[in-house]
């Protein structure tokens, strides 16, 4: 297995502030333990920073314990015990409980650190900061400058924002009047408030000044306009940025001084040793609340200044091998069907390969195709199936099931290695499928002096540096690592692509504490705040076009510069919580890449009561796991702890649980020791809180000892986050700049009776052929004798199956035939053929068929081919020909390629590119001679014409020859590149198969593949003289 990745020299180390020896101190005497903890200055400050409510309850417990009785006492006890356990065992950064630092790879291990190097870094909470900003924007509007929010876009006669930051408004919009367009143009760059007002007065002199002021104030209040006070999310100190901007705009000095006092107190608090800052923290919060009242005005993190921790290069090599294995094991993107793959098909059905569509138009349910299935911010205005098939091959599933039963029988871990994977994984992987970078998390343990790695519960992140981003303010060394990663990212990224940082203030502003980071990327899209980059390098939501490349992957392009953009976010905020547009941009940056973190055992073993330990070589991927339900213990709602103990210990013996295990929820881990009544009590209460059909997940504690140690030889839990980068740069991807055509222009959108009349005919799929071959064909023959019109049809699902029928003629002609059309539609309904008919606008797929100048010829070919297909289906239904529909379809496809004046070799090249070359070989071999004979075009299809029905088929197909030749002449004249020519021919062939076979893409692939096999076999015979060259 080829190595695909290189770990970076440096990684993040995450260490709790308390060593393991403290976690069980006085654990059996619950009252004493509570008193010890509540009098521990370090624990008190940790709780104060994390939960002010619990901190105040500690005071109640110490000063007036009688006030805590019954349920209140029990809840307090549970909360304290859980925090006490997490502070020594959980490495995930949270307030002052766990620290972040930097470690490195070296020749040998160095696992000790200075326990006195822990430090804290407080900064203002982003929610508090934005409340202050909104207050200043409201009170000192006339002193500020404003720009248009990059989250703003115009649709129809209204301007919208992608989302709101008040956490409740589903949609924010204003009328897109001439006044708004004027402000839009003026505030593309920062404009002083007074200049905005002056411009409006000059353009609307008869409008009262108070009305102008109110209009602009409304835009500011709704956040269409954002002030210069709003700090970029990628600067190191947002509060200092605000102070500097306020000073430059002459905000009253007393307010600025209040901010400076807070900044001074924050700096002073940061210098105080952790565990000694309780009093200063309370004073600081009080000062901040005097200015702006908030539930949690301060964000505090802990750091580890000692960077001497080292892991040996052998560990680095093992991690790179694991990263490669994960990628090889992942299903090729072409073999998976998820929400994005399904969206590819929806996009192509609507727009085709040659069209680039504005992002926001595409995602709109009314003007576009809506958001992908599973997107909810906002949800589509139509129902969509969101279930997807198996993501893993049957071979992969069988392999892991076999491994499972072997492991259970032998009572041994599921052991994976390269040799076993060679049996189920393809050793070849396409370059474009290899992710550019990612991160892996490991708990670091020690066995007999050797480092042992355990994959962390949250596994890692999808881009190197994401885990570091939120902590970039903690130290220069963390910022430098991010800078190095972003520079390396630039070197490895496909040369025609620019990486753009998605910098957002989330709809729940407090979540902005997670999205604050530092970025060294070339481009930035900042939503609801200002960008740290120059205007030329800032991207707006309205700037983005979406297309699909020839590898069937989405891409984004800047509509003005033409640059290909890859969007990333240097933080760990959950994309599922983001607005649809932002989530989509992040997801398509990994479109076509292997989903390395979609592990087979997650889904294959998901409902198993017990899962053995899983290992790859010496790395533990998953410790033993169990699921326990209330029903396992016959547990009712009023069960006492004593009643539960006996059935639990029986469960414990039956399933051979260890003495210590974790209750796990995502990366939340709560240590339980069954010989410790305090933690056992916690376990029972956690189980009691679950629903009857909701299990607790239990995970065995790691076998090995904690590896990290302080100068006093105390052991600490430790976790590392290792960035990995692909070894080779991405191959260049050439995407031609397409000639954009106005999305809603009259050349694209044809309203009813504007030369076209488009009707959707909803009917059962079982009666589609009857509708096509008889009703539509007969109706057209009837009206074409009276009116100069033409028509074409195609089949579609939205998701209901229907026929899309279009008539073309002058407006007066279409109006004249409309009464007959209505009578015909009425008769179809009476016959039970059509359940619903809808007249709507016709959106021409201009790019897909070569541009505006070729569209008339393409539509003429659609009309001729529609008549051909109507005749083909009719002949089959009337049994005028005995040739099967599949064979007739093959003949039709090959004859179409001839009518496009492609040589035999060009036909074969086209089919090689548009078929599944390794599929349907058995079926072809079964009737090889028949396929070769009937699909042979030698001597003007002499073999086909020998039979009467073959002759009928030949004459039918010949009727579209002139239209096909004319279109072929035009596309060859318009495009020098054969790929472009083949693309247009492919679209015509696809639409022909759609008319003949319906929306069954699998059958279409089969027909094209059998055509390929037939021509390939003919080529062999022709080369050997068995067939005459045409």
Curated annotation (Swiss-Prot):
Function, as annotated: Involved in the post-translational modification of the lantibiotic subtilin.
Organism encoding this protein: Bacillus subtilis
Protein location: Cell membrane
Pfam families: Lant_dehydr_C (PF14028), Lant_dehydr_N (PF04738)
Family: To S.epidermidis EpiB and L.lactis NisB.
Keywords in alphabetical order: Cell membrane, Membrane, Transport
Protein name from the UniProt record: Subtilin biosynthesis protein SpaB
Database matches in InterPro entries: Lant_deHydtase_N (IPR006827), Thiopep_bacteriocin_synth_dom (IPR023809)
Primary gene name: spaB
A GO cellular-component term linked to this record: plasma membrane
